[in-house]
Amino acid sequence: MGFMRVKRTCLFSIILLSESLLGPPIAIAENPNYSTEVFKFKSVSRGKERPVIAQIWVPTNSKGPHPVIVTQHGAGRDGLIFADGEGRTDEYSSRIIKNGIERGFVVAALDAFFENDIQPRDKKKFPNAYRYALDLKKILASDIRFDNGNIFYTGFSFGAAQVGKSFDIQYASDAKPWRAVAAAEPGCNAFPEPIKATFPVLIIKGSESHYYLEPCQHFIKMLRKAGNLVTFLLIKGANHFFSTDGRITRGVAVNGCRFNPLIRMQIGGWRFADGSKATRRLFIDKCFTNEGGSGRNREHLNKVIREVINFFESNRS
């Protein structure tokens, strides 16, 4: 069908249009160790249909069906650009991709901000990207190249918050649940009253994060009380970006409900942890702050990536 020029990255250069079991992809890139496909699909966020773009990397040096990692970017997409030049992801997912391929996983990265000029400061505009991940999982599970009994989910920051939604009762009817999930640096200022899931969760926090530990401790306590298997890892000396050069700066963050996080109740509605009723207005007034964080030498990030992939590997069926 011809060739397509794209912005070159360190991962690929030649793009060939083709078709696969996923439907007509935008592009397929060839590499001695993996092939990759970029494709678009429709999903829903807060009642509105949205376009989503995703890229998958498939190892070619091992036989399938392959286990799959779905990875979700944070608020800043500061990592690799997709092969088509449109979608992109963050540094966390970029390293999950590289290391996941080396360990024999298919890795699928989705861009939840596709065709929207959403910046890290635009937190009130962030979509409900967990639905995007579920729809992507459904697409991947239908492809015979992939092991639909071993599909994993991870994300950083905003992406980690989406991972937390996998314990929300509104998604309990998910026909093919994740094999395991991992949340890297979730903020935990708003989370669902958790149900008991069939899969374990790994939660990783930095001890010096401006998204403080206390609300995540509350979430972990509730997860365990519901009967979930939770592994918690605290990275000493690491900030939100798993770096050692962190400092507090001025910037929009959802970290004001450190000691009284917002909880989406199983019976419906929202309440603060102290039992008081919550509204969107109260959530914005109490939980949104100008206390941001910076410092991105990422000294601890490779350790985090190894822990996540090791966790997934140890939970394969």
Region roles according to the model:
Residues 30-64:
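N-terminal cap/lid segment of alpha/beta-hydrolase-fold proteins
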Residues 62-66, 71-117, 209-213:
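Short substrate-entry loop that stabilizes the transition state in hydrolases
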Residues 122-144, 165:
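Alpha/beta-hydrolase active-site loop
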Residues 145-157:
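Alpha/beta-hydrolase fold nucleophile elbow
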Residues 160-172:
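Short glycine-enriched nucleophile-adjacent loop
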Residues 173-188:
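A conserved short beta-strand
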Residues 203-205:
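Short beta-strand/loop motif that positions the catalytic acidic residue
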Residues 229-317:
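C-terminal catalytic histidine-bearing segment of alpha/beta-hydrolase fold enzymes
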